[in-house]
Design a protein with these regions (language model features):
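Acidic, proline/glycine-enriched N-terminal capping motif
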Residues: 1-84, 94
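Glycine-rich, small/acidic residue-mixed loop/short-helix segments
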Residues: 2-5, 11, 99, 204-211, ...
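Short amphipathic beta-strand starts and helix->beta connectors
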Residues: 34-43, 86-98, 129-131, 265-269
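Acidic, low-complexity central loop/insert segments
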Residues: 46-47, 55, 94-189
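Short glycine-/aliphatic-rich beta-strand segments at the starts of folded cytosolic domains
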Residues: 47-69, 136-149, 232-243
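Short, conserved charged micro-motifs
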Residues: 62-67, 117-121, 161-169, 246-252, ...
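Short, low-order "capping/linker" segments at domain edges
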Residues: 143-151, 185-200, 315-323
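Anionic-ligand-binding alpha/beta catalytic cores of soluble enzymes and soluble regulatory domains
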Residues: 158-241
């Protein structure tokens, strides 16, 4: 099997296409103007090539009840073609896997971060036992795209051999930088970039979007329920407004500092960052819960003002606010 995550997308041949970096290198970062591309997506037009993401298919008559029992999401009443996001947690409640997908009546189709499907399928495969489900990675055959629509922007799964035809119908093409800038501004975390091995869903705003609180038991539920009931998760996701005079962005994982001189201490790390066409340079970061909201932090020598994404008191008595 080829590795589409390392194979450049055919859409990199479109006019103005510039490849991304790191795990995002197989797709276009932009097509000449990431600011204009952000405005295009905000207007409800255009699409984003996400064909470097992994795609899996889960088939069999017991697939939804099986997923319901293993994950944080409620699958029993999932409507056909309704997209949903689910997590698989460790026994201690830490996020190990994340995926988004929909059911077409015969199979559940999901996509995950580039290169993440192998570990996800390995774990799922060990949970099959006598359950009537079949697992397959289908990244060779299917590609992911994001389609901006005025009424309901959504992901599309496209036969990989038809990507160029899809682009002609769904255009104009917008790059990953535009997609990421808008995602960051919404305060939506990206798994494995804005999270680490200790992340619990309560810290990053996944209660609701990816964690259903009214369902049966699943691995890691005790931690999620306890923190939700008592409030005050150990850390919180925050949106950083970076100093616009610096013509650079912090790398994922860069340490976030508070204080000065001998009183300087590490209070978290930066994940995703981007240049937003209105907000300027922004980033998502995980910081300790007790970091004062009004304090300006520092990352890679740049001042960083905070905007609340996850309330430090979030829990049963403080509901998360959708941005």
């Amino acid at each position: 099997m080829t590795d589409p995550a390392k194979t450049p997308s055919p859409l990199l041949s479109l006019p103005g296409a510039v490849a991304g970096d790191g795990v995002d290198a197989p797709v276009a970062a932009h097509y000449g103007s990431f600011n204009a591309e952000q405005r295009t997506l905000e207007s409800g037009e255009g699409f984003v090539d996400l064909s470097h993401r992994d795609v899996i298919r889960i088939s069999g008559p017991e697939r939804l009840t099986w997923l319901h029992s293993l994950t944080t999401q409620h699958f029993l009443q999932l409507a056909p073609k309704e997209w949903t996001t689910a997590l698989i947690l460790s026994p201690q409640g830490h996020v190990e896997h994340a995926f988004s997908g929909y059911d077409d009546g015969e199979s559940f189709w999901a996509h995950s971060e580039p290169g993440a499907a192998a570990a996800l399928l390995d774990w799922l495969g060990r949970m099959v036992f006598m359950t009537r489900v079949e697992l397959a990675e289908v990244t060779d055959d299917w590609a992911v795209a994001w389609r901006s629509r005025p009424d309901a922007p959504t992901y599309d799964l496209v036969p990989r051999g038809e990507l160029e035809t899809y682009a002609q119908a769904a255009g104009p093409a917008c790059g990953l930088w535009a997609f990421e800038a808008l995602r960051i501004a919404r305060g939506e975390p990206r798994h494995l970039v804005d999270t680490d091995a200790r992340t619990i869903p309560n810290e990053v705003g996944w209660i609701g979007p990816a964690v259903h609180l009214d369902k049966g038991c699943y691995r890691g539920q005790e931690t999620v329920a306890r923190v939700h009931t008592l409030g005050r998760p150990p850390r919180r996701l925050t949106l950083l407004h970076l100093d616009g005079t610096e013509n650079r962005l912090p790398a994922p994982g860069t340490e976030l500092l508070m204080g000065s001189g001998e009183a300087t201490k590490s209070v978290g790390f930066v994940g995703s960052s981007a240049r937003h066409h209105e907000l300027g340079p922004i980033a998502l970061a995980l910081v300790k819960r007790n970091v004062p909201l009004e304090v300006t932090l520092e990352v890679d020598g740049m001042p960083a003002a905070q905007e609340v994404v996850v309330d430090p008191e979030v829990g049963l008595h403080v509901r998360p606010k959708l941005r």
